[in-house]
Amino acid sequence: QEVEDRECQGMTVSQFFADALGLHIAARTTHQRAGLNYGNLLLSRAQPVRTAAHDLAFSRREPRGAIEADFVIHGHNLRVVATHFGLSMRERRVQLQKLLPYLEDREPDLTVLCADFNEWLPFSHVHRVLRRVLGAAPAVRTFPSRLSVLSLDRVYASPLTMLVSIEAVATAEVRKASDHLPVVAVFDLAGIRS
């Protein structure tokens, strides 16, 4: 969702992973720090039919953004949005308001929102609104990676019936790589009725 896109073997980290894994890439730089690009990254097996980048910046806080990608899979229009919300409650509320039009759009049959919400309270404003728009999101503990007690990272799926399983991956390597555990969500789109 958020990546420091430094050079790796003659290309950006994003492109390196996309090439190594045979994936398609959608990326958005939100800001630069010490000459490095920072931003959002979405890698996918399927080729998106459309991608868009959305500015979720708030006041003088660290710039934030979202990647939106539309796919056609098994005859369904699928929208995937990946983002990373800010640290303050006010910032997260504003970012949610900026993102809502893309989540409330009923053109896609299916919607998936993957995010580090920086929000651990299940009854927070952000999660209450998202439950109303997309339905419930299973909570898996992802932060801090060394002793995960908070569910900062979530995957919302609408309809939820397409979500087969969801888990946080907790290995020694993962814990060294990030302060958050990655979330793996498995979807079954073939069984969804139009």
Question: Where does each model-flagged region fall?
Answer:
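A short beta-strand-loop structural module common to alpha/beta enzyme folds
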Residues: 1-3
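Active-site regions of metal-assisted phosphoester/phosphodiester hydrolases
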Residues: 7-9, 15, 19-194
